[in-house]
Swiss-Prot record:
Its cofactor is pyridoxal 5'-phosphate. Residues 1-24 are annotated as: Disordered. One of its GO terms (molecular function) is histidinol-phosphate transaminase activity. One of its GO terms (biological process) is L-histidine biosynthetic process. It comes from Xanthobacter autotrophicus (strain ATCC BAA-1158 / Py2). Pathway: Amino-acid biosynthesis; L-histidine biosynthesis; L-histidine from 5-phospho-alpha-D-ribose 1-diphosphate: step 7/9. Belongs to the class-II pyridoxal-phosphate-dependent aminotransferase family. Histidinol-phosphate aminotransferase subfamily. This is Histidinol-phosphate aminotransferase. The keyword Protease does not apply. It catalyses: L-histidinol phosphate + 2-oxoglutarate = 3-(imidazol-4-yl)-2-oxopropyl phosphate + L-glutamate.
């Protein structure tokens, strides 16, 4: 007996369409735009737009990556066993409390997909990482933005926004793109003020760079509380951004729930092995910390000496503020620097249209940026068209 074909009936609440349509809300999401990598027409480019380490990855990680390339026909370990064990060894953790993902971006998206749905609310600070909003909307939730104080997360402002619909609070500590941080007493106060059914997600992507006595990553809180997850990344100090490696630690019930949503082979073998080698190379990490400790204050002092404001940073980048004056704006500065092969990050999408974010670079790049900004602020646009090119 042949089947009877019927005209399709539009889903309730959706208009008839002649093509597949995404579910409501998807097209309202502003796609993430990464930092630029190129400067058109410039011979030598210094990418200072994405907060990557200027020292590159550990040689041990590079060797592990190369070795992994000898056996690409096999599926990766879906449980990321070798990487979770390496992380556990480095931090004295139970590997069962660790989940790994393709960058901390995947971790943040996983936690949103696991705990957030239509009608739920997610709180984050007004200049917080853009992925928080994207992950919330992609899960069908409602973003709730807390005002900051002096470009720093405000615990009281966050707690004032908590409602019975709140499911998650994202806190970047240190924060990107401002470089500011909350002392851990404030983080504890935030946690103490949250209902037990609200998950606090501490995004500590830049934790290794912080050298402040009142700072903690949140690791201990993630191990002892039932509603705290701490996420980390290999993209910054470990120099493995191209491999997309992130991880998180938290309560067993949270990790179990996230693993049920996680894809079965969400990380590739080269990433797993390179990440395991990188986290075991403490000497390489210390070199990166020392480089940043040398150049972050130097850049801050030099740039402030040009009459520009720099938000005090504890990370591996600076937020540079420009006047809203024709010829001196952040957008014009970005174009000026780009012509010299110096690629910084515009942060208007973060609600900071008058600022640029600069990664701490190599010694050469740092000096070139300061020299270029000096020319820009003085109106000397003809001095050296390229940072390292033929026109200099």
């Amino acid at each position: 007996m042949s089947a009877v074909l019927k005209d399709p009936i539009p889903a309730p609440g959706r208009p008839e369409s002649t093509r597949p349509e995404p579910r409501p809300g998807v097209l309202a999401i502003e796609a993430y735009v990464p930092g630029k990598s190129h400067a058109p027409g410039v011979e030598k480019v210094f990418k200072l737009s994405s907060n990557e380490t200027p020292l590159g990855p550990s040689e041990k990680a590079v060797a592990a990556f190369a070795e992994a390339g000898r056996k690409l026909e096999d599926y990766p370990d879906g449980s990321a066993t070798v990487l979770r064990q390496a992380i556990a060894t480095a931090y004295g953790l139970d590997p069962a409390r660790i989940i790994c993902g393709a960058g901390s971006d995947e971790i943040l998206n996983l936690v949103a997909h696991t705990y957030v749905g239509p009608g739920d609310e997610v709180i984050f600070s007004e200049h917080g990482f853009l992925v928080y909003k994207i992950a919330t909307l992609a899960s069908g939730g409602t973003p709730v933005v807390a005002r900051e104080r002096d470009l720093t997360a405000d615990v009281d402002a966050i707690l004032a926004l908590v409602t019975p619909r709140t499911r998650l609070v994202f806190l970047a500590n240190p924060n990107n793109p401002t470089g500011t941080y909350l002392p851990f007493d404030e983080v504890r106060r935030l946690h103490a003020g949250l209902p037990a059914n609200v998950l606090l997600v501490l995004d500590a992507a830049y934790a290794e760079y912080v050298r402040r006595n009142d700072y903690e990553t949140g690791l201990e809180l993630a191990l002892t509380a039932d509603n705290v997850l701490m996420s980390r990344t290999f993209s910054k100090i470990h120099g493995l951004a191209a491999l997309r490696i992130g991880w998180a630690v938290g309560p067993a019930h949270v990790i179990d729930a996230m693993n049920r949503v996680r894809g079965p082979f969400n990380m590739n073998t080269p990433a797993l092995l390179a990440g395991a080698a990188a986290i075991a190379d403490a000497a390489h990490v210390e070199k990166a910390v020392a480089h940043n400790a040398r150049w972050l204050p130097w850049l801050t002092e030099q740039i402030e000496g040009l009459g520009l404001k720099v938000t005090p940073s504890v990370a591996n980048f600076l937020l540079i503020h420009f006047p809203d004056t024709p010829g001196r704006t952040a957008k014009e500065a970005d174009a000026f620097l780009m012509k010299r092969g110096l690629v910084l990050r515009q942060v208007a999408s973060y609600g900071l249209p008058h600022a640029l974010r600069m990664t701490v670079g190599t010694e050469e790049a740092n000096h070139l940026v300061v020299a270029a900004l000096a020319d820009f602020m003085s109106g000397n646009s003809s001095a050296g068209q390229e940072a390292g090119g033929k026109d200099k």
